């Protein structure tokens, strides 16, 4: 048997048609291994090898369309690089998942980042509503009016600004708009400033079974009329329960958890995932401080 294998080896070894010159390839591979590559190069190679399986999920359908000219806008030019990265990521998530939470800390410019996203959708001829607490009215009005203190007046922003409390009103005027005439269901994008105010979810209470603001938002703005994307801004999206976050995320899929389950293609429902996370957190919180690690 050994003699037969040896004869076969000799036959192949002496057959020039079966030989392949690999010297140059071996030298190239060895050289690559021993090259002194920059830290940046090694960093990006590492990122690629970790995340390359997710690249197939990225398509031109969900990437920002630069042909809209939003990168030539005044607001875009005023952003820091980290805000530009955030804006592009937000647009991607709005297109792919229909919703996004921008949860940067106070002072990191969430308003300006959101304005750049609004500009992107306005350039696509989309109708945008900003819902904010009444105390923040001037914060948003400044950037849409032709005021001398408006640094982005050249962008001619045209979004509407209404208040959280307006969701429960049926008449009267608010921020220069007649609430009798507002077409709540005609907004392609709603930006909710301080979205943590909607963390308690939908409830019907009282003898007359009145909807709370959360349900008003779902039924008047998100579920009704055109398909509405939801951008939420909050430095504190979670108070002390994970359900706070779940209720806000639910706004992006019209309160129907199965819609998000289908989009994420998870093995468990989003409701079960949050319940499991809350249980794990409650257990962790009871441990002694020295035992509370993230490992």
Describe the predicted segments one by one:
Residues 225-241:
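Conserved helicase ATPase motor motifs in RecA-like P-loop NTPase domains
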Residues 42, 240-247:
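P-loop NTPase catalytic cores that bind/hydrolyze ATP
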Residues 67-78, 111-115, 119-226, 256-295:
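SF2 helicase/translocase NTPase motor core
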Residues 105-106, 194-196, 235-237:
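Conserved Walker B
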Residues 97, 109, 139, 240:
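Residues that form or flank phosphate/diphosphate-binding pockets in enzymes
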Residues 1-105, 112-124, 199-209:
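ATP-dependent helicase/translocase motor core
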Residues 99-102, 129, 231-232:
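Short hydrophobic/aromatic beta-strand immediately N-terminal to the Walker A/P-loop
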Residues 245-258:
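A short helix-turn-beta junction within AAA+ P-loop NTPase domains corresponding to the substrate/partner-engaging
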């Amino acid at each position: 048997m050994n003699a037969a294998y040896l004869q076969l080896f000799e036959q192949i070894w002496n057959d020039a048609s079966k030989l392949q010159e690999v010297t140059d390839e071996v030298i190239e591979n060895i050289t690559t291994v021993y090259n002194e590559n920059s830290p940046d190069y090694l960093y990006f190679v590492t990122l690629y090898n970790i995340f390359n399986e997710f690249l197939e999920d990225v398509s031109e359908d969900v990437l920002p369309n630069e042909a809209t000219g939003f990168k030539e806008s005044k607001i875009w030019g005023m952003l820091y690089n980290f805000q530009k990265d955030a804006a592009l990521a937000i647009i991607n998530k709005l297109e792919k998942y229909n919703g996004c939470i921008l949860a940067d800390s106070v002072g990191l410019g969430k308003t300006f980042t959101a304005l750049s996203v609004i500009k992107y959708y306005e350039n696509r001829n989309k109708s945008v509503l900003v819902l904010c607490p009444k105390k923040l009215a001037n914060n948003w009005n400044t950037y849409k009016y032709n005021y001398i203190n408006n640094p982005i007046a050249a962008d001619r922003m045209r979004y509407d600004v209404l208040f959280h409390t307006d969701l429960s009103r049926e008449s009267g005027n608010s921020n220069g708009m007649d609430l009798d005439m507002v077409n709540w269901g005609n907004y392609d994008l709603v930006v909710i400033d301080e979205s943590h105010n909607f963390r308690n979810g939908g409830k019907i209470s009282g003898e007359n079974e009145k909807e709370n603001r959360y349900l008003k938002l779902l039924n008047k703005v998100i579920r009704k009329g055109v398909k509405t994307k939801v951008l939420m801004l909050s430095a504190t999206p979670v108070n002390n329960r994970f359900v706070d976050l779940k209720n806000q995320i639910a706004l992006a899929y019209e309160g129907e958890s199965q819609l998000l389950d289908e989009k994420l293609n998870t093995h468990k429902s989003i409701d079960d995932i949050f319940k499991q996370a809350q249980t794990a957190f409650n257990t962790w919180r009871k441990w002694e401080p020295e035992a509370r690690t993230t490992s």
